[in-house]
Amino acid sequence: MYVYIYDNFLRAKKYASVVKAMEVNLTDYGIAGKILRLNNYIDAKPIIDDEIKRGAKTIVMVGNDQTFGHILSRAATCECSFGFLPVGPNNSIAEVLGIPVGVDACEVLSRRRKERLDVGWMNNRYFVSQLHVLPAKVEVFYDERFRVTTNDKMEVVVCNLQPFFWKFNKKDTDLRVVHPQDGKLEAFLRPLTKTSWWGYTYEDPSIFPFEEMEIRGEEPFAVEADGKVTKEIKVKIKLAHSKIDM
């Protein structure tokens, strides 16, 4: 049995036609199912667990990158298969997974092809898209061999499934991208140097794959992972291989 979890933004009128067309296609393919609406303030895991008890075998997320991260970061341990129907903008994860945005995604889902996805593990919780440490005075240790420090602040981004787009500065016209790698987490480390009383200048970043990382700060620093922001003094990050059936 299929259960479809719609993100709340799909209630907007501009998405009505594509959502209706997708529902028609799913019925034609014989994989229509129960529809639930996602509230961003509700943990998806107990809802999914309850649907599994009622016989659900496949949970299909309908939305964008934020939908994908919000649900899977909380429900990665659920005993079911997951699917994804991307709708609208902000769907870089769909591109990585090779899923077209909109109605054509229904055909991909109907093929029932399964893969195992890696997820990131951070301080006893999962993240599936990317983790972002906002500029702070931190030091980084990775793969138990290397240490990275700066005199001032450092920005850290760890990519699992979602690419990270960046520029050298505000005047830079070229948009660069950090692509995730299979079997590895991808790190983006960029030091900041203080140039004035209020200002900082970004230095050239370091980009590399890794398996385990620890980020430490003398004071709590902000960490954003799959849309959830927390304050941490130390973050341990590693890859959980083949955690999600999708």
Task: Please provide the spans of the model-predicted regions.
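Short beta->alpha connector loops
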Residues: 40-42, 64-67, 194-195
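Phosphate- and divalent-cation-binding pockets in alpha/beta enzyme and binding domains
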Residues: 70-71, 92, 224
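Catalytic core of DAGKc-family lipid kinases
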Residues: 76-174, 179-186, 191-193, 200-202, ...
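Structural motif
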Residues: 6-9, 64, 131
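ATP/NTP phosphate-donor binding region
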Residues: 1-59, 69, 73, 77, ...
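Periplasmic-binding protein-like
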Residues: 57-63, 188
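ATP/nucleoside-binding phosphotransfer catalytic cores, i.e., glycine-rich phosphate-binding loops
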Residues: 189-246
